[in-house]
Amino acid sequence: MASEPKSLSLNLKVKDIVAGYGAVRALHGVSMSIGQGETVALLGTNGNGKSTLMKCLMGMVRPTQGSLELELDGHKYDLARLSTEQIVNLGVTIVPEGRRLFPKLTVEENLLLGAFRPQARPDIAKNLAFNYEAFPVLKERRTQLAGSMSGGQQQMLAIGRALMSSPRLLLVDEPSVGLSPLLVSTTITKIKELKEQYGLTVLIAEQNFHQAIRIVDRGYLIVHGEIVFEGNVASLESNDMVKNYYLGTA
């Protein structure tokens, strides 16, 4: 993946976001942040608003209140006022829940579809080579139809497709969904390797607490559309609220 110059900076501040679907409110004043080079987890069980926040960040759901302030290299943008295309062109890319591949296209064709951001087009060959180095199985199966791959292989392809856009901020929505425990561990490990090797900034929404905390710097626990706790890994593991509401062990 073509790397950005080290002088570039990124900071995302989610402020008091209220959002939902029609009359159903899914987020109730959510605030959080992520800075350059961080990996941050949005933790919580299904139905608590994690994916809704991800969709807000991508312009797929419009907040009714609050702001999504992205600062890039000294320039500020409110993602709540931008289209999905504009957000992607800023370098924000998502690995969606359920992977959302094109099953009747080959592995390589799916990867190439990820390079639609104008800034990524000059680096298509370089990013394709990067993906084949990072995910050898994709190179081995580059002519195979995506729909015929295993769930774990499809997850790797979904991550690779996102990396083809040379993202500044990578959103990963529920990477463990539909995968066996072994494949979940493999996927999380790969995200960790990519972060450490290339300095990616990653926001991961994940219900699997124990896997997520392996790779993150900080985390936020969201319950019923509200952030109820935030902290580093040590505080997440030791906090009674997290144990009670998420782990059920307090």
For the regions a language model picked out, list residue spans one by one:
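ABC-type ATPase nucleotide-binding domains, specifically the catalytic core motifs of the NBD
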Residues: G22, V40, V107-K126, A134-K139, ...
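Conserved catalytic motifs of ABC-family nucleotide-binding domains
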Residues: S166
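Helical segment within the ABC ATPase nucleotide-binding domain
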Residues: S185-G199
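Conserved structural motif at the start of ABC-family nucleotide-binding domains
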Residues: L12-V14, L27
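ABC ATPase C-loop
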Residues: A162-L163
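The feature captures the beta-strand-to-loop junction immediately N-terminal to the Walker
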Residues: L43-T45
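Helix-to-loop junction immediately C-terminal to a conserved catalytic motif
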Residues: M58
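ABC ATPase NBD Q-loop/coupling interface
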Residues: S67-V88, V233
